[in-house]
Amino acid sequence: MSATDLSPTSLREAFGHFPSGVIAIAAEVDGTRVGLAASTFVPVSLEPPLVAFCVQNSSTTWPKLKDLPSLGISVLGEAHDTAARTLAAKTGDRFAGLETESRDSGAVFINGTSVWLESAIEQLVPAGDHTIVVLRVSDIVINEAVPPIVFHRSAFRKLGA
């Protein structure tokens, strides 16, 4: 191993060595599905049920979601590599080709994912060029038959057996 500078490029490469799951955060805004993808998801607490993810402060999608009463979190499965890229795109229909389910609360979920978490924002924590979004979970749906997708070194991968 060798020392490397702390440039954003070097940090992104270093952080990319840590494998992570991928989630979609989505809701309906004035009848339109709005969502984004994140690979910085973490369970936080069982009592109360809290989870968190990080969002870039430069996101143009987050301002549309951050004041809503309910958000849908879908934990993407290994069949969702294309969906993850589409949801992370800066332009275009992020839900193209995806089957979704909307709840009366406005939360939107992607069908065929491993877990749905309906949630509401509990706390926003400024953290450098990102914001840590802490969410209180109000409902869960688990689909144990769906294996997860993993984001590692800028690529989507499947877990080995």
Swiss-Prot record:
Keyword Nucleotide-binding: yes
PANTHER family assigned: FLAVIN REDUCTASE (PTHR30466), FLAVIN-DEPENDENT MONOOXYGENASE, REDUCTASE SUBUNIT HSAB (PTHR30466:SF11)
Pfam families according to UniProt: Flavin_Reduct
Identification of the protein by name: NADH:FMN oxidoreductase
Organism of origin: Mycolicibacterium goodii (Mycobacterium goodii)
Compartments it resides in: Cytoplasm
Pathway membership: Sulfur metabolism; dibenzothiophene degradation
Binding, FMN: 30, 37-40, 54-61, 88, 94, 151
Catalytic activity from the UniProt record: FMNH2 + NAD(+) = FMN + NADH + 2 H(+); FADH2 + NAD(+) = FAD + NADH + 2 H(+)
Function: An NADH:FMN oxidoreductase which supplies reduced FMN for the '4S' desulfurization pathway that removes covalently bound sulfur from dibenzothiophene (DBT) without breaking carbon-carbon bonds. Can also use FAD. Provides DszC and probably also DszA (DBT-monooxygenase and DBTO2-monooxygenase respectively) with reduced flavin (FMN and/or FAD).
A molecular function (GO) term: riboflavin reductase (NADPH) activity
The protein's Enzyme Commission number: 1.5.1.37, 1.5.1.42
Primary location class: cytoplasm
Any coiled-coil regions, as ranges: none
SUPFAM superfamilies: FMN-binding split barrel (SSF50475)
Similarity remark: Belongs to the non-flavoprotein flavin reductase family.
